[in-house]
Regions:
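A metal-dependent hydrolase metal-coordination microenvironment
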Residues: 4-168, 177, 185, 193-195, ...
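C-terminal functional module detector
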Residues: 1-34, 46, 55, 219-225, ...
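Conserved catalytic scaffold of divalent metal-dependent phosphoesterases
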Residues: 170-172
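Short alpha-helical interface elements
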Residues: 86-87, 215, 282
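Catalytic-core region of carbohydrate-active enzymes that cleave or remodel glycosidic bonds
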Residues: 181-184, 188-250
Length: 362
């Protein structure tokens, strides 16, 4: 069984499939549809933006690429969110600052993604020493070195505003061997699939970030994973995530990100543990069942001629694996483990079509 990380082996933790009516899973996903999009891209919005594609050109390209949303995370400014072409049905509010820490002396990039436009400015204004935000639609802010405690305070402010806080391209930016330097705290996420400068998910950057995420899970950290192409050039769909939402608009996708109820990649993974959704924590009890379905695939990125498989993992290893077939469904008994999660893998080379997020147990 090939896997994206060539030297990584999942120990066996076998679970036998059980019969299920999938009523709990179907109830959780009732009224929700699969939407595809990238939380992290850049546009040519003027000012200090460094993307090559104007927002109005992004809107046209998204239809051709079968993308439902894009997070325009243009640097050092807020003006992109005020353009007439910024449509909140398709674009997400936010920006990508740099975190420059004093102790340890490390640099990171992170995303602040919001459900409403004014939240970003409120956070910037709440930290004058850290951003020196000039205010107003044309106001810019700076990347200023700060203590890690102030960075954590910014994170807390973002979360209080109902925003998402994401560690962007972590292994490509943070030069450290200490997991604590990659851990932005409870309620945050990190990018695993990183297709920047690559046409698809199987690339050295994804391998590095995916291994980091596995190490963080193994260390007991609750960390959500996402996918991105961090697109600065011609529009691409190489970094899409799959989000099941009852609404088709930016704030709804951000709410699912905050919950951790989504998966990286272009194949949708539906999963629950009894009534508990992806991204949640459940109290273990005897007789629980994990239910998984794979019904939705991106029409341009998924190749039905390839062979794919669905793997279900626990903290102790590979619990279940089966070929991906149309309308895939599997149920396994829940054992006393720390978490369960699922992924979809291309058989010939181990490339991930989807990396799901966990359901944790306590």
């Amino acid at each position: 069984m090939k896997h994206i990380i060539p030297d990584y082996t999942f120990p066996a933790d076998p679970h036998e499939a059980v019969e299920s009516d999938f009523a709990a899973l179907d109830a959780l996903y009732a009224g929700r549809k699969a939407y595809y999009g990238d939380f992290h891209a850049h546009s040519n919005s003027g000012g200090t933006s460094d993307g090559h594609t104007a927002p109005e050109e992004w809107l046209k390209a998204m239809k051709e690429l079968h993308m439902d949303f894009i997070g325009l995370m243009d640097h050092r400014q807020v003006r992109h969110m005020y353009l007439d072409s910024f449509d909140p049905e398709y674009f997400l509010y936010g920006t990508e600052p740099a975190g420059l820490w004093n102790d340890p002396q490390l640099d990171c990039h992170y995303l602040m993604i919001f459900q409403e436009r004014g939240a970003l400015e409120r956070v910037l204004q709440a930290f004058p020493a850290e951003f020196e935000f000039e205010g107003g639609v044309e106001g810019h802010f700076k990347y200023i070195r700060m203590d890690r405690s102030r960075f954590d305070a910014i994170r807390d402010a973002v979360l209080r505003e109902g925003g998402a806080f994401v560690n962007a391209h972590p292994m490509q930016q943070i030069k450290s061997d200490d997991l604590r330097d990659f851990d932005f705290g409870p309620g945050t996420a990190l990018e695993t699939i990183y297709a920047c400068a690559y046409p698809e998910q199987l690339n050295p950057h994804t391998i590095e970030n995916y291994r980091l995420w596995l190490d963080m899970l193994a260390s007991g950290r609750k960390m959500i994973n996402t996918s991105t192409a961090d697109d600065h050039g011609a529009p691409t769909n190489a970094g899409v995530n799959t989000v099941y939402s009852a609404e088709k608009n930016g704030p709804a996708y951000v709410r699912q990100l905050i919950k951790g109820d989504l998966n990286a990649g272009f194949v949708g993974i539906k999963m629950c543990m009894d009534e508990h959704p992806v991204g949640s924590t459940a109290a273990y009890r005897e007789g629980m069942t994990l239910q998984v379905k794979v019904d939705d695939v991106h029409p341009l990125l998924f190749d039905p001629a390839e062979k794919w498989r669905v793997d279900i993992h626990t903290d102790e290893g590979l619990a279940y694996s089966a070929p991906l077939k149309q309308h895939f469904a599997a149920a396994i008994p829940v054992k006393r483990r720390k978490f369960y999660w699922a992924e979809v893998i291309r058989e010939r080379d181990g490339a991930p079509a989807a990396i799901g997020n966990p359901i944790w147990l306590e």
